[in-house]
Amino acid sequence: MTDIAIVTAVRTPIGSFRGAFAPLSAVDLGAAVVRGLLERCQLPAAAVDELIFGQVLTAGCGQNPARQTALRAGLPVDTPAVTVNLVCGSGLKAVQQAVQAIRCGDAGIVIAGGQESMSNAPYLMHGARDGLRFGHASLQDSMIQDGLWDAFNDYHMGITAENLADAFDISRERQDAFAASSQRKAAAAIAAGRFREEIVPVSVPQGKKPPRVVTDDEQPRPETSEQQLAQLRPAFRPADGSVTAGNASSLNDGAAAVLLMRVDKARELGLPVLARIVSSAVAGVDPSVMGIGPVSACRQALQRAGWTLDEVDLIEANEAFAVQALAVGQLLEWDSEKVNVNGGAIALGHPIGASGCRIIVSLVHEMQRRGASKGLATLCGGGGQGIAMTLQR
């Protein structure tokens, strides 16, 4: 099988909801990260054969946002681009599709990743097509409807998390402890400057004022304690729930991208091989417990790689909810000391279309820093799916 290399891996800072990146669209963020990627590797834009980008919240964004990103980033007009939607796994699915394109010989050099502006998801008015002739009309939040709502059971993703708490007997205390740990790990990573290498600064217009350059993640709350988290009310099941705003991932804006090509092509161009992509898998599960999707996906990806879980040195697993991450860890029985060593989505944020690539970016850089040999990245996805990918240095 053809060895595929990641030669550059970058991301924007992650903005909080209606925060620093509120003036920017998903395409703005995607274009910024693609420009940053090309600058890092000093590769001419014309050398890129295709761009594949994940984005979940595309309502009102215009045709094929990935194509908009490609052209705004300076890729030639004859370079194709496609937008991918696997909900939270979109960014990682984009990477998987890029690998497949290169292995099939359909492309030589591909930029893959994801972008999302949850801050700018529009409201929808159903029924207006035929005219609202009398009475009231209601607006529907496209962020919730298209990104956070289970289409099969007609309830919020938070209820799927509550279902996991019930099924696996995971207490509120364990969830809060996990969330506080994620915040502490992220705070330590930021203080040590461990995200600097992977982040591309983003310039944000401020009208007549000079642009603001955002260089750091906006979401982390380093002062968070378990005692503070215990004071929060359940967000989705008020009477007896355990999932809160503090032990769940947040609403965010951001983008991430990787540059992929064959290992021999990278060496020919004098580009570094940060990691090789070994295998990947997507798996379906019951939508009502979508959070366990990574279990089957990880098992399949590891089997395809010929690895055992014990061989893996580092794991990046998206923290959609603390209870979801705990349930996956419980089922896979992985070593928690290897997982999200610099914090996860509960602390850093979860821009849903970008997170799949964001965890790859963070994993690659931490593998480099530690001299780790084998890595695993995985996410769950709304609608009952999981995706996983194995990397090797």
Model-assigned labels for residue ranges:
Residues 1-61, 65-73, 80, 160-172, ...:
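Conserved active-site "lid/cap" helical segment
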